[in-house]
Amino acid sequence: KPEPVAIGKARVITEGETLAIVSIGTMLATCEEVIARLSKKGANCTLVDARFAKPIDTDLLDRLCKTHSALLIVEEGAAGGFAAQVMQYLVNAGHMDSNVKVRAATLPDSVIDHAERDFQLETVGLDATSLLQQAESLISDNINMANSAHS
């Protein structure tokens, strides 16, 4: 049965505790692939479908910053978009003063050569492999500890 969508409320796809990936728009399927690949490496991650560029779900962002060591915001948009709104909120709410690492994976603020979408995303680092590398760099200590435990 379909549930009503609350305006400004994100949807948590998977719940974890190390890294939270907050995706908006067309990047959700790619982020699901990244989460699956991280899980195989022993990382327990959260995936959020932001659903709304405005208003942003500040309650969820507050919770994620308190319960996760890192946050990766992913959007197929450029400077001044959703990721910028989230970062501004995190700064103003004091979350950037805490121990949470925050990164944004977005399109560059430049012209992208005409090509197939997958090639363009790979070129700008928004493909699954590039996002996986960014995520791993944020939580490398956690992945190394998980791999040691399985050895």
Model-predicted regions and their roles:
Residues K1-S151:
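Thiamine diphosphate
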